[in-house]
Regions:
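Extracytoplasmic cell-surface/polysaccharide-interacting catalytic and binding patches
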Residues: 1-53, 126, 141-150
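Solvent-exposed, flexible loop/coil residues
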Residues: 8, 70, 75, 79, ...
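Generic recognition of cysteine residues
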Residues: 12, 21-24, 62, 68, ...
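Generic detector of short, locally flexible boundary/turn motifs and exposed helical patches
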Residues: 26-29, 55-60, 86-91
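A short linear-motif detector with a strong N-terminal bias
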Residues: 40-42, 69-73, 92, 100-102
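Extended, low-complexity, intrinsically disordered C-terminal regulatory tails
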Residues: 46-77
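Catalytic cores and adjacent binding grooves of peptidoglycan-active enzymes
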Residues: 80-81, 85-86, 90, 94-150
């Protein structure tokens, strides 16, 4: 993990630091995830995010990484089987989200890439097949797009 700290990726995120999730043990700075999920998070960063950051040449900020089930349920629109709960997903943003999305797709190591108006959701499965699914969030849901449409 070259460009992201564990605390940055594994905190159970709230808008303000003092509002971190009170339903899980991640209310303080931590260096280890529950249930041995460290390997998933490290694989996501090492295989997907660090190479993207290297090629992009500018900072990438993590909006949300790991989420405990209670926090995930409180996130509007979050899937009940969200990869955030498995430490397999991050929501990120940078100064050029479109370029970042293209870099991740070109690298070829991702499970799902969802383009939202202000951030990108990216996931990677350390174990099992990765779908290489590219979606765009629309007013009515999600639309599958090709790499050319990014």
């Amino acid at each position: 993990m070259k460009h992201f700290t564990k605390e940055e990726v594994i905190r159970c995120y709230r808008e303000r630091k003092q509002d971190r999730c009170k339903d899980c043990r991640l209310t303080q700075a931590v260096t280890k995830l529950p249930n041995g999920l460290d390997e998933n998070m490290e694989a996501l960063v090492t295989e997907v995010m660090d190479p993207a950051r290297e090629k992009l040449g500018m900072p990438i900020f993590c909006n949300s990484g790991f989420r405990c089930p209670s926090h995930n349920a409180a996130c509007p629109g979050a899937s009940k089987s969200s990869q955030h709960m498995k430490a397999e997903a991050m929501d990120v943003h940078c100064a050029d989200n479109k370029r970042l999305a293209k870099i991740i797709v070109e690298n070829g190591k991702f499970d799902q890439l969802i383009i939202y108006p202000t951030f990108i959701h990216v996931s990677w499965k350390r174990l099992g097949g990765n779908r290489k699914q590219i979606l765009r969030k629309t007013a009515t849901g999600y639309r599958a797009i090709s790499a050319v449409e990014i």
